[in-house]
Structures are given as structure tokens and as C-alpha cells.
């Protein structure tokens, strides 16, 4: 509808993008590796992205809520092996675009939570394709509506 095209639900939009990106690592293949090594590498790529996104989201909170200075943030991020130049880039980004990283991380987390809930609820009847179809059929919307709608679609 025209009104929905004007409303933004960044958590859904960016969360779905992040969810899809992280899910895509399930299809990542490596030459000359056995199945177990491939699975471990897929998980490593996924975990690395989650860690990077989490650190960026925490940086946003520390700068915009806890009033971290550039020096504070550099010191904090250095504990994770992040160079001063990279910390400066993150600092400048979160100052100019507060809460942006949070829409990615919290949006992804909410979708991951919803998937886990549906998997637990449906057990062996859970179908990942049906879950993805249910999420996408809702379109960009607040998570309260998404959770209700996906639950209804998946349990029909």
C-alpha cells in the first residue's frame, strides 16, 4: 500500500538483510576441505560478522549514551585488536548516524529469536523455507506484528 511505502521499519529491513547475509554462510563452499572443516569455516565467518556488528553496536551505545570520547572508544576497541584508525572511523560514523548499527544488530537478533521460537514450537514440522516465506510475506513492519503474523502463518 502507498502508506506502507512511506513508513520505515529499519529493524525489519536491516535485520532481514543481516539475517540473510549470515544465513548465506550455510552455502559457502571451500575447495579441498571436508564437510566438518567447511562447517567450522562457515561458522567462523558468521561469528566474525556477528562480533564486528556487536562491537559497532556497542560503540554506538557507548558514544551516544555513555558519552565516550574518541579516546575512550579507541581504548575500549583496542582490547579487541581494533586499530586506532578503524576505531576513529567507527566513532565518526556513530556520531553522524546514531542507532544505525542497532537496527542491523537488534533486527537480526529479533529475527533469529523468532526463528528459534518457531523451531522449538514446531519441532520436526519446522520448515526454514516456510519461515522465510512467512517473514517476507509480512513486508516491512514492526516486530510485534511480525511475530504475531509469522506465528499464525507457521501454525496454520
Give the label of every model feature segment.
Residues 1-156:
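N-terminal maturation segment of proteins
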